[in-house]
Amino acid sequence: INSGKEVGAQIVLPEMTDVRVREAARELISMDFDILNIEDFQDNLDIYLDFLNKLPFTDNWPADNLREFLNDPLHFAMAMVACDDADCLVAGAVNSSSEVIRSVIRMIGIRPTSNQVSSIFFMISPDGNSAFTFADCAVIPEPDSKQLAAIGAESAEFHHFLTGDEPLVAFLSFSTKGSASHYRVDRLRDAVEL
């Protein structure tokens, strides 16, 4: 949290119709975060339309379709991030995980060194002294060993980026110290060796 405040991170919350998001916005503002209002960026619509028009998935879209697409607050907020008008966005209270992920892949893209998209839950202890990263809880239901290794490495990297702490990585399964023989346990064992 302090890292975000120190760099002056600008956050856009595209789902302000949800009471929980409005409460979160108030809390973030009370913590001195800069919460951007989508309405304040309507003058940039032409910039966002031009950006959107250059993306592969909008090939041959008429101007009306581009405008309609950006009428969705999630897509508009993604354009804000992609065009460097916001540092990050938080979504998923109103839109499904798949809608958010699809929009990220289409409009922002994934890191060139990554072969997949995965998710994390970043949890801060009630006293604020500890942070935990849990992955992948929502995107890849049956990752293979290579995917598990990549998820672990990228999650550890993200944890370090957010906290500055050296992460300790654990792969969890239903087997206690190798008590079970199962292909799901074998995948975890193989991932650790990678």
Model-predicted segments: where are they?
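Anion-binding alpha/beta catalytic cores of soluble intermediary-metabolism enzymes, centered on
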Residues: 1-34, 40-194
